[in-house]
Amino acid sequence: MLFNQTLTYISLFSGAGVGCYGLLEEGFECVATNEILEKRLNVQRINNKCKFNDGYICGDIKELETKEKILKQIEFYSKKFGNDRVDLVIATPPCQGMSVANHKKKNDEIKRNSLVVESIDLIKQIKPRFFILENVPSFYKTGCIDKNDNLLEIGSMIEQNLSSDYMLYDEIINFKNFGANSSRTRTLVIGVCKEFKDFISALEFFPDFKEEKTLKEVIGSLKPLSWGEYDSTDFYHSFRTYPKHMQEWIKDLKEGQSAFENTELNKKPHRIVDNKIVLNVFKNGDKYKRQKYDSIAPCIHTRNDQMASQTLFTLKMIECFPLES
């Protein structure tokens, strides 16, 4: 916390900084943000996420140099602004190796899963008042390789390393029950420094339960778009064109139906190889599926009422981005 009582945080695996946007709206100040891809950090720069350019740290969290840059920025805030301690560390390690949506898993995914170990290592060094880890539902039970080259469940690794200093709470929740406009089931792990055990518990961090919204309630008032059309009131509400032959796949679908359910071969998702129809592999049950207007929005696919994918504007509404962002 700074001299002026402003709460501080550090974001690991921060992507384009979407999650951090909410923290900034709540008055937190970002001491450092770490992301391996420069183009994602550039989005954060555009949104002025950090006050100082040194706060944008591009690099692999496994590298000592990257960790030292984060720790150096913490020291800078301590000396310059009286930050007695980082209040919050948030980490969302890559989940591709754990996600059921990833059908292209590689044999070395457990190494990528083990990036969470680097997060825990930094939390031990930073000693924040609180930390939050967020990931896929299987997160806590997924295997990782710890610093001693032992294979163990991520949950066990977290508890072994942090339970002596933090009260730990993990739960699988669906964010649709807490104000999100789409169905998103995730594991949350919340750590509260034991110094505060008599004052606060992890459960107090959860927002109040909210009634879920249907897709119609979220985007139903927006203007329908024709092929290639832009809404004159918002550039980002625009019809994203796609290969015309795909229209046959989706034009006759009813709400909730997938193009893979079409009975005619040429209306199923496919490609042409040697003048023959080769069907696409049916991996995700909701791919090429027309959404239901009176249900909570799933992952992003074909609209319910148009032969189109969602626009950037509707995606912002479904994913709860601030519309002015």
Regions inferred by a protein language model and the residue ranges of each:
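Redox-cofactor binding/interface segments in oxidoreductases and associated redox assembly factors
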Residues: 91, 133, 301-302
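Class I S-adenosyl-L-methionine
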Residues: 73-85, 96-285
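Acidic-residue sensor for enzyme active/binding pockets
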Residues: 35, 134, 325
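Class I SAM-dependent DNA methyltransferase catalytic core
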Residues: 212, 253, 262-325
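Active-site donor-binding loop signature of nucleotide-sugar glycosyltransferases
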Residues: 59-61, 175, 302
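A residue-level signal for beta-strand positions that form part of recognition/binding surfaces
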Residues: 6, 186, 297
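Core alpha/beta nucleotide-donor-binding catalytic domains of modification enzymes
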Residues: 2-126, 137-141, 145-152
